[in-house]
């Protein structure tokens, strides 16, 4: 999920057009075991495992400077551990399943780890992730580094405007679509009076499986979804796992544009996702294309409300994400009533549901009790009687 989103493994499974999930809020000790065939009798293998153990013992679920991670990566990426929100979710059983030299790279080792939970007194093991980091030499010592930088090292890339697109050698790069995405970043930033993000890296992949693999996740639960995207606004990174959109995954680019508004931590995660959905679409559809599915859902669920959606978002089904789409409509309503400044007020309303909905009602000139009725009218208004 996006930074600021709910910490639930299932949420990360069903919302693949989201951004990063949050890392665990409280660090739990990690038990690191060595799998069959992982030999640490000699160096550098012994030193690398000790390095990994030291990093895992130093609150890896929270973002803080680490002597165990590449200094150059920490300088480039403010939230330097790309997989922080995915793998550090309180699962206690960690096993190093591979520690081998990386093919085609000097002084570089692949460190692949399985994260799992145990159940029924240890009789059942349920994996959360199989992921990789790399151990590299930097300033005469071993440090850890992200997989995506090594796995895409030889990929073609092209810079258009403020966005550098990186794509597999087998991929047919759509320069026209990429140029339109770069223009979208600039125009959206200008419309909201925000500085356009610079130095954006946009990684194009064919599908979600390849996207996760490039990020370093050889396995991560993705449900039935085969397309989606991820972004890290603070690191100016976008990963597109949807070949239909390729260079045009605007939802994730919108998150980067709105980062100056949402980074202070006073924005409800669904307001952030709704804003990106309203301006950048989601699941391969633009905002208008998402509305019919939402309208059919609202008509079939007469008791649904903004509060119920925010408190317990329904699982995504196909292209329908009631939380994202429903709050996109709310953002649109607020914009039509009060323009950009009203949207900024909604974004700054706070992280609680009561703060968000109370502010939305005020911005729309409604009583709190009338907000849902107005929202339903807007959603259902697109359906033919």
PLM region descriptions:
Residues 1-10:
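Bacterial N-terminal signal peptides that target proteins for export
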Residues 24-57:
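Short, low-complexity N-terminal intrinsically disordered segments enriched in polar/charged residues
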Residues 33-36, 57-102, 211:
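Short solvent-exposed beta->alpha transition segments
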Residues 80-124, 239-242, 250-253:
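Surface-exposed, charged secondary-structure patches
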Residues 155-268, 279, 355-359:
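Juxtacatalytic substrate-recognition/specificity segment
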Residues 225-227, 244, 263-385:
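Acidic/His/Gly-enriched intrinsically disordered linker/tail segments
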């Amino acid at each position: 999920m996006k930074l600021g989103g709910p910490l639930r493994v299932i949420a990360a499974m069903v919302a693949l057009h989201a951004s990063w999930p949050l890392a665990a809020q409280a660090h739990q000790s990690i038990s690191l075991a060595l799998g069959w065939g992982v030999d640490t009798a000699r160096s550098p293998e012994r030193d690398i495992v000790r390095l990994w153990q030291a990093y895992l013992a130093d609150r890896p679920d929270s973002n803080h400077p680490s002597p165990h991670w590449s200094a150059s990566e920490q300088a480039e990426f403010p939230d330097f551990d790309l997989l922080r929100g995915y793998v550090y979710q309180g699962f206690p059983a960690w096993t190093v399943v591979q520690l081998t030299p990386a093919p085609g790279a000097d002084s570089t080792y692949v460190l692949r780890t399985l994260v799992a939970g145990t159940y029924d007194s240890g009789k059942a093991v349920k994996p959360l992730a199989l992921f990789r980091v790399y151990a590299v030499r930097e300033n005469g010592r071993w440090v850890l580094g992200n997989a995506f930088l090594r796995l895409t090292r030889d990929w073609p890339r092209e810079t258009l405007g403020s966005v550098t697109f990186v794509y597999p050698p087998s991929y047919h790069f759509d320069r026209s679509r990429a140029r339109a995405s770069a223009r979208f970043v600039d125009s959206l930033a200008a419309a909201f009076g925000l500085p356009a993000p610079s130095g954006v890296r946009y990684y194009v992949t064919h599908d979600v499986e390849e996207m996760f693999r490039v990020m370093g996740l050889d396995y991560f639960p993705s449900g039935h979804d085969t397309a989606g995207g991820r972004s890290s606004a603070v690191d100016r990174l976008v990963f597109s796992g949807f070949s239909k959109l390729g260079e045009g995954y605007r939802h994730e680019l919108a998150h980067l544009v709105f980062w100056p508004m949402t980074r202070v931590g006073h924005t409800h995660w669904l307001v952030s996702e709704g804003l990106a959905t309203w301006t950048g679409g989601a699941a391969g559809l633009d905002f208008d294309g998402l509305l019919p599915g939402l309208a059919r859902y609202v008509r079939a669920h007469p008791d649904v409300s903004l509060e119920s959606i925010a408190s317990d978002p329904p699982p995504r089904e196909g292209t329908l994400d009631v939380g994202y789409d429903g709050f996109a409509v709310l953002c649109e309503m607020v914009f039509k009533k009060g323009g950009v400044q009203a949207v900024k007020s909604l974004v700054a309303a706070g992280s609680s549901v009561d703060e968000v909905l109370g502010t939305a009602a005020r911005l729309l000139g409604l009583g709190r009790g009338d907000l849902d009725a107005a929202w339903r009218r807007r959603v259902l208004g697109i359906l033919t009687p």
